[in-house]
């Protein structure tokens, strides 16, 4: 974006989902930008045609489009695709036991769906939680700057104290908790001060369950289980 409100857009706005992009986050509507993003074979063009309609950096508004544009910015800045960037800078240094899979929009376009569809196993997902718990360090190697980590796991805006940079923020019995929330009940849950990391993979417990309701069950049960076996 070279002109208009988009010219004010920063990487931090994208990471905190406050870009002001024209985007409606509806998953089950046939005619909707989010639905289209899952089925298009040219995700790059779809995102670049979205307008910035509100002043960036004002408030949090959940938007898969923000995350996708952020992924495209990283791709442009590093001159490599997201899969290779993640592999070379994170999964290999962190010793992933299995190769992760990332869904593309199409073989021809070859762009990763940055907002979703990254598949791995519980143990390897937990490594991301550990990286953030350790302020970006892995075996004394700095993979992420600690200043960025601090911003990621703390609220960006007062009126949305539940979101930082890509992480959801909670408290449990006065303990700080930050989580990665995936589709249909997949979570990475981190208690940074207690050093507890919980990963839950799978589908929702039953039709009609609320993601947040399920999450609080996993936080409570996981914490109680972890502390009972110490």
Language-model features and meaning:
Residues 29, 51-56, 66-68, 107-114, ...:
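Flexible glycine/proline-enriched surface loops and loop-helix/loop-strand junctions
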Residues 227-230:
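Residue-level detector of functionally pivotal "anchor" positions at catalytic/ligand-binding pockets or at interdomain
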């Amino acid at each position: 974006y070279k002109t208009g409100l988009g010219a004010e857009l920063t990487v931090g706005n994208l990471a905190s989902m406050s870009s002001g992009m024209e985007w409606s986050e509806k998953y089950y509507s046939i005619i909707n930008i989010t639905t289209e993003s899952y089925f298009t074979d040219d995700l790059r063009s779809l995102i670049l045609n979205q307008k910035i309609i509100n002043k960036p950096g004002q408030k949090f508004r959940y938007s898969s489009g923000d995350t996708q544009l952020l992924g495209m910015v990283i791709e442009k800045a590093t001159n490599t695709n997201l899969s290779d960037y993640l592999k070379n800078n994170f999964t290999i240094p962190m010793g992933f036991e299995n190769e992760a899979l990332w869904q593309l929009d199409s073989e021809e376009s070859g762009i990763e769906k940055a907002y979703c569809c990254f598949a791995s196993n519980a143990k390897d997902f937990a490594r991301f939680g550990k990286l953030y718990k350790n302020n970006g360090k892995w075996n004394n190697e700095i993979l992420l700057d600690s200043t960025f980590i601090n911003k990621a796991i703390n609220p960006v805006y007062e009126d949305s104290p539940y979101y930082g940079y890509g992480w959801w923020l909670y408290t449990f019995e006065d303990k700080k908790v930050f989580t990665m929330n995936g589709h249909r009940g997949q979570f990475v849950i981190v208690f940074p001060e207690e050093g507890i990391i919980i990963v839950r993979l799978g589908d929702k417990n039953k039709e009609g369950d609320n993601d947040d309701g399920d999450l609080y069950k996993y936080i409570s049960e996981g914490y109680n289980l972890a502390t009972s076996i110490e």
